[in-house]
Structures are given as C-alpha cells and as structure tokens.
Amino acid sequence: MMNIALYLDAGIHQGGWRHPEAVSSGGTNWPLFRRIAQQAEAAKLDMIFVADKLAIDDIYGGDLSATVRSRPQGWSEPLTLLAALAAVTDRIGLGGTVSSSYSLPYTTARQLANIDHLSGGRAAWNLVTSVSDAEARNFGRDSHYSHAERYAR
C-alpha cells in the first residue's frame, strides 16, 4: 500500500517572492495553510506533514544579524498548526516534528495525545534529535548534544 503525504512548508523558500501569486507571510498565513490542507484532503492525500527546526538557519557565515535581516519570514510551530488544522479537516492525517533533544517527554506526549483526540486519531509524530548548535543555544546550551547523548535521551 502506498501513502501520500503533503510536506506543508508554505512560503519559506528564499526565491519564492518572485512567483506572481506568492505571499510574504506564507510561513504563518493561517488562511493559506487552511486552504492547502483542505485541498490536500479533497485530493485524497493521506497526511499533511509539518517539519520544524528550533533555530533560524545560519546560512550567512555565522552572522546572526545578517541571517535575521535576510530571512524575515517566520514559520509556524507544528503542533499548534496541526491542532488548528484538525478543526478544519475530517480525514487527512496530521504529522508534525518534535525534537526529543529539546522537548520534555511528558509535555510532548500530552500535546500529541491531545491532537490525536481532537482529530479523531489522526496525529503522527516525526521524532528528531535536532542537528545544530544554533538550536542548542536557543535552549541555554553552548553546543548541541553529542550523538550518544541525543539518542540516550
């Protein structure tokens, strides 16, 4: 059996502004996310997937101010967005990323269980351990956990 998921990542591509129908707030635009989710469900896709990273990509050589100036768009936190999408869809699965390195097990389980209950059993979890020192700094650490530490958590 084949399952088809939509990677819901609207409006964050750096060159996306050049498209004539582009919106500048794509990463946090609720009407856009709602419309895409409903269209995916109408097309009989199996799941919507929302990825996450807990830091702004550092693509400007370690200069955070240049990164912030050059990448003004934000993006939605997956579990909050999926809870909202549960209310405007009926069948499509709702999958989101949560980092085991920087999220507490009880809180994560509670949030995912809540989405699962609200959606009638449609929640899915993309478990990641995160990848960067930038993410670690957002949680009071100087550097990211070692590979062994990440997988021991």
Region locations from a protein language model:
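Glycine- and other small-residue-rich loops at beta-strand/loop junctions that grip anionic moieties
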Residues: 74, 97, 104
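Generic hydrophobic/packing signal
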Residues: 86-89, 96, 102, 119
